[in-house]
Amino acid sequence: MEQTQDGGNLSGVHHIILVLSGKGGVGKSTISTEIALALRHAGKKVGILDVDLCGPSIPRMLNAQSKDVHQCDSGWVPVYVDQEKSISLMSIGFLLEKPDDAVVWRGPKKNALIKQFVSDVAWGDLDFLIIDTPPGTSDEHISTVDALRPFNPMGALLVTTPQAVSVGDVRRELTFCKKTGLRVIGIVENMSGYVCPHCTECTNIFSKGGGEELARLSGVPFLGCVPLDPLLSQSLEQGKDLMQEFPNSAAYPAISSITRQILDMASPQS
């Protein structure tokens, strides 16, 4: 257990991972979703907390957008994505009257909901809780880190794309982690090359190696590259499990490798 005190609704959660990105559109929610699915295939019980309040996309990625959140004595009961109840999900997307409603809130109201999400969701026993955060470094990130600090999170996973502008934003994310005392468990480079669906050749549309070079210079682990893969996009659009439905996907081995490294890091703490 990572918690050092009675954690209330988080007392049964063994490892907490925050997924961060310096800018929007780098596939942070995609990586959060795929790692959660891969952890489930490794026999782990996983929760996903979607605190990207203005862009809650994970319910759709897991084909759970039509499900409802219920109340219990301990607070909110998360939505279970599968029949085995091995993946549970909480998102503001479940609390909106209409899926297309915009969240037009000022900072204090957002921060209050984040704190409520951290304290009032009845997760039960989980091996991993993955927290999908908004892009950038804002009030919401500070509120999330502060609310989780008593529970000693495993650390932050930083997602970037190969372009220099994205890598530069991740540098600021590294500074944020350092200032808030949040351990960085690794960097993932997403959209790293395009895999042709016909010949499976990988072409570097943007560039390559920016995330790995940043990890080397910063002294943090580089967990791997995930290519642009039409099958990965298809699985997310259809709300399907990539590893189950598309085992020949080019992204499959990359996601599997990243997940194995996370499991290896977590095992000494279990």
Curated annotation (Swiss-Prot):
Keywords: 4Fe-4S, ATP-binding, Cytoplasm, Iron, Iron-sulfur, Metal-binding, Nucleotide-binding
Keyword 4Fe-4S: yes
Required co-factors: [4Fe-4S] cluster
UniProt gene name: nubp2
One annotated Gene Ontology cellular component of this protein: cytosol
Organism, scientific name: Xenopus laevis (African clawed frog)
Subunit structure: Heterotetramer of 2 nubp1 and 2 nubp2 chains.
A Pfam family matched in the record: ParA
InterPro entries documented for this protein: Mrp-like_CS, Mrp/NBP35_ATP-bd, NUBP2/Cfd1_eukaryotes, P-loop_NTPase, YlxH/NBP35
Family: Belongs to the Mrp/NBP35 ATP-binding proteins family. NUBP2/CFD1 subfamily.
Alphabetized GO MF terms: 4 iron, 4 sulfur cluster binding; ATP binding; ATP-dependent FeS chaperone activity; iron-sulfur cluster binding; metal ion binding
Residues bound to ATP: G22, K23, G24, G25, V26, G27, K28, S29
Keyword rRNA-binding: no
Name of this chain's protein: Cytosolic Fe-S cluster assembly factor nubp2
Compartment annotation: Cytoplasm
UniProt: [4Fe-4S] cluster binding residues: C196, C199
Role played: Component of the cytosolic iron-sulfur (Fe/S) protein assembly (CIA) machinery. Required for maturation of extramitochondrial Fe-S proteins. The nubp1-nubp2 heterotetramer forms a Fe-S scaffold complex, mediating the de novo assembly of an Fe-S cluster and its transfer to target apoproteins.
GO annotation (BP), single: iron-sulfur cluster assembly
Manner of cofactor binding, per the entry note: Binds 4 [4Fe-4S] clusters per heterotetramer. Contains two stable clusters in the N-termini of nubp1 and two labile, bridging clusters between subunits of the nubp1-nubp2 heterotetramer.
